[in-house]
Amino acid sequence: MATKKQSELYSGKAKTVYITDDPTQLILYFRDDTSAFDGKKIERFSRKGEINNKFNAFIMEKLAAAGIPTHFERLLSEQESLVKRLEMFPIECVVRNIATGSLCRRLGVQDGLDLDPPVFEFFLKDDARHDPMINEYHIRTFGWANPKQVEQMKEYTFRINDILKVLFLEAGLLLVDYKLEFGDVQGQVLLGDEFTPDGCRLWDVKTREKLDKDRFRHGLGGVTEAYEEVARRLGMSL
């Protein structure tokens, strides 16, 4: 029996989440919206929602095949996916393989510097406070996750890094950095949210051309075209 979409649960920067007639499942609707700088810059790009929906499904299926448990279940339509309902941790896990963006601004390191080993950072999901950086002591003290869950998130994040660096490199792309979000269902930590060019940085391996949301952030144009190029290189069917 088909899952029935019911009322809106939450509307974020580029996705809307709906509850369904099954309390264990949600529907993610990937919109064409794009925002940057905490919502100060907003624009719509034709087909972006469809590309991100299919891109996310592609990556989630690759990760699941490699043994990473995720909330993704299946595509429902051009812009909708069915996912497991998780109790999300209010935390972003960020891995940086190449220095750029806020890391360079904070630490004064050279833009484009290869980072070995990669840098791992936690951020609190709080738009009003601009997603401040936190550490494991904050997480433990304020009860955002327990130590076992924190270790599981870190382990999965680094395993995902190993998997995706190879996947993208084979497509002629550098995985510069990315963010992940996790949640809990029945005591198990699962990868939630999404993995799309909205939440990672991807550069051409030879030219270091930006093929991600930085094209929107920095007014470079060609946002949809860049996302399509990444999908094409990965062999995705759009």
Curated annotation (Swiss-Prot):
- The entry's keywords: ATP-binding, Ligase, Nucleotide-binding, Purine biosynthesis
Q: Can you provide one Gene Ontology molecular function annotated for this UniProt record?
A: ATP binding
GO biological process per UniProt: 'de novo' IMP biosynthetic process; cobalamin biosynthetic process
Which catalysed reactions does the entry list for this protein?
A: 5-amino-1-(5-phospho-D-ribosyl)imidazole-4-carboxylate + L-aspartate + ATP = (2S)-2-[5-amino-1-(5-phospho-beta-D-ribosyl)imidazole-4-carboxamido]succinate + ADP + phosphate + 2 H(+)
Q: Pfam families, per this entry?
A: SAICAR_synt
Q: Keyword check for Cell inner membrane, yes or no.
A: no
PROSITE patterns reported for this sequence = SAICAR_SYNTHETASE_1, SAICAR_SYNTHETASE_2
What SUPFAM superfamilies does this protein map onto?
Answer: SAICAR synthase-like
Cellular-component GO terms for this entry:
cytosol
Query: Does the record carry DNA-binding as a key word?
Result: no
What EC number(s) does the entry state? 6.3.2.6
Which EC main class describes this enzyme?
A: ligase
Q: Which cysteines are joined by disulfide bonds?
A: none
Q: Cross-referenced CDD domains, in alphabetical order?
A: SAICAR_synt_PurC
Pathway per the UniProt entry = Purine metabolism; IMP biosynthesis via de novo pathway; 5-amino-1-(5-phospho-D-ribosyl)imidazole-4-carboxamide from 5-amino-1-(5-phospho-D-ribosyl)imidazole-4-carboxylate: step 1/2
Family, similarity comment:
Belongs to the SAICAR synthetase family.
- Per its record, how is this protein called by name? Phosphoribosylaminoimidazole-succinocarboxamide synthase
Q: Which organism is it from?
A: Nitrosococcus oceani (strain ATCC 19707 / BCRC 17464 / JCM 30415 / NCIMB 11848 / C-107)
Q: Which gene encodes it?
A: purC
